[in-house]
Each structure stands twice: as structure tokens, then as C-alpha cells.
């Protein structure tokens, strides 16, 4: 919704300050290099394109033009160099792994079985798995079934984790379209794997675009805090009203995918 609002002019941005892990002296930006690498800058792309003025704030200023460009110099008005744009340890080191919690593994197995027996796990499937331990574990069970049957996914869409990018590297996923990254393995994949593509938040889920990527999804597996018997989903609070989560691509995936499976939010 936000990307749509920016592009239609409903949300006007006077100045966009964009954290740039790497920026050359001409204003080209990427998020896959530098000490503060964060991966895809998909959610900053609409801001850079439509803001009246764009300021790149970087702790990785380089003198030569960047080979990998997420946001081009034509959209950047000013560059500000600072000592640090943030703490990269806030991004999971390595890759988010399959859960070892027995209860979560049971739920993950059920999720994978639902996907299988609903007839969704077929050659050319397009899927999205969230960053929670259960979602990643479900992806692991799905991969096991893919190994058994020889099924290959046409594409993965949405936030990228190390586990999903390993599936990409090993040929279980044909290509990946990525508006954000969850761990350092995913960041490395985006930089080095030519089948791993950075996309904007608008390309991912703008309902006003001709065909947002979420509309291609066969199935999405995401985290939730509560789900009632009528399939209404809460991703913000626990049963006592305490904020413990946030909606990411949940509404978008729910609108676009053929089927959505929600798991409980990882602590």
C-alpha cells in the first residue's frame, strides 16, 4: 500500500533520507556491499524515485562507479558520509536455520503436508516463506518432498533467507525475486547469484501495477500471533494486547497467493 500511495501522489515525500551501505561519489547506491550491507533496498526504491529530494546517507563511500546498483545516481541529489549508518549485527549472522523446537517442527510438518495434499506442490510452483523458524522449517520439509519427487519450483518471491537461497543455489528454486533480506547468507546470494533478483516494494505488491509479483504466488507461509476459526489473522499483538509482531508482506501475500498458511510467531 505504501508504494502505491507514493506513486499515485497520495503520499508526497519532500525529502527521503536513504541509508546506503555502499555509495559511489556519483550517487549510485547498493545494499550488498560495505560494512553495513543489508541486502535488497526494495522498500527504499519508491522513495528514491518519487521524493522531491533524495539524500544518500552512507558509511561506505567509494570513488569508483558501482558495478551493482540498486538505486541509480539519477535519483540521488545529495550524499552525506557518516561514521556508521547502523549496527549490522541486527541482521542475523549466517543464515536463519530450521527450528529445533519439537512443537515447532510438528507444526512445520503439518504446514508442508497441507501444501502437499492440497495439490499445491507441483512442478513450477511459486512460493513465499517468511523468516520465522516454523516457516523456514516448513520450507525444509517441502524441500525434502521436492527431493523425493523431483519437483522444482519456478520461483521464490518475497523476503529472502539463507535457507531459501541455498535452495536456489542447489537448483530447487529456479529464480528468486527479493524486496528484502533476512540474513547475511541471503545478502551474499543477492550479490553473487545471477538468478537472485532485487525488486522494489512496488513491483512486489503494488495493487495498482499491471501484475505485482504477489499475484504469481501459489502458496505463502507466514507468521501470525493469532488466527480465529473464521481465518481472521492477527500479526501484531498477543492475546493480552501486547505488541509482539508487525505486518510485513502478510496482507499483500494474502491478497495475491492462491493459498496462505499462517504459523505462530517465533519468540
Question: Which sequence ranges carry the predicted segments?
Answer:
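Active-site glycine-rich loop that binds ribose-phosphate moieties when present
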Residues: 1, 34-43, 106-111, 202-205, ...
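Ligand-binding beta-strand-loop-alpha-helix segment within the catalytic cores
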Residues: 1-23, 153, 160-226
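A generic local secondary-structure boundary/capping motif
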Residues: 2-10, 19-20, 40-47, 65-70, ...
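His/Asp/Glu-rich metal-coordinating catalytic cores
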Residues: 36-41, 61-81
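Gly/Ser/Thr-rich active-site loops/lids in small-molecule metabolic enzymes
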Residues: 37-52, 147-161, 235-262
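Conformationally flexible catalytic loops at phosphate/diphosphate-handling active centers
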Residues: 74-98, 102, 106
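N-terminal active-site beta-alpha-beta segment that forms phosphate/nucleotide-binding
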Residues: 99-190
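Conserved small/polar residues in nucleotide/adenosyl-binding loops
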Residues: 263-267
Amino acid at each position: 500500500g505504501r508504494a502505491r500511495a507514493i506513486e499515485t501522489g497520495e503520499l508526497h515525500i519532500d525529502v527521503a533520507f536513504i541509508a546506503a551501505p555502499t555509495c559511489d561519489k556519483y550517487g549510485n547506491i547498493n545494499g550488498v556491499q560495505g560494512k553495513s550491507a543489508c541486502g535488497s533496498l526494495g522498500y527504499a526504491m519508491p522513495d528514491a524515485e518519487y521524493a522531491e529530494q533524495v539524500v544518500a546517507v552512507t558509511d561506505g563511500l567509494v570513488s569508483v562507479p558501482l558495478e551493482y546498483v540498486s538505486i541509480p545516481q539519477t535519483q540521488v541529489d545529495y550524499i552525506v558520509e557518516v561514521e556508521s549508518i547502523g549496527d549490522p549485527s541486527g541482521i542475523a549472522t549466517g543464515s536463519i536455520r530450521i527450528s529445533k523446537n519439537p512443537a515447532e517442527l510438528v507444526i512445520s510438518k503439518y504446514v508442508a503436508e497441507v501444501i502437499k495434499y492440497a495439490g499445491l506442490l507441483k512442478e513450477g510452483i511459486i512460493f513465499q516463506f517468511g523468516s520465522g523458524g516454523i516457516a523456514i522449517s516448513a520450507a525444509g520439509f517441502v524441500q525434502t518432498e521436492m527431493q523425493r519427487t523431483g519437483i522444482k519450483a519456478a520461483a521464490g518471491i518475497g523476503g529472502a533467507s539463507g535457507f531459501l537461497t541455498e535452495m536456489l543455489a542447489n537448483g530447487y528454486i529456479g529464480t528468486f525475486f527479493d524486496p528484502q533480506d533476512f540474513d547475511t547468507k541471503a545478502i551474499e546470494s543477492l550479490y553473487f547469484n545471477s538468478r537472485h533478483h532485487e525488486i522494489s516494494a512496488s513491483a512486489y505488491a503494488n495493487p495498482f501495477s499491471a501484475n505485482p509479483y504477489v499475484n504469481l504466488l501459489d502458496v505463502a507461509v507466514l507468521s501470525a500471533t493469532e488466527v480465529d476459526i473464521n481465518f481472521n489473522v492477527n500479526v501484531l499483538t498477543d492475546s493480552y494486547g501486547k505488541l509482539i509482531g508487525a505486518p510485513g508482506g502478510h496482507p499483500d501475500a494474502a491478497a495475491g497467493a492462491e493459498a496462505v498458511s499462517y504459523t505462530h510467531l517465533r519468540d
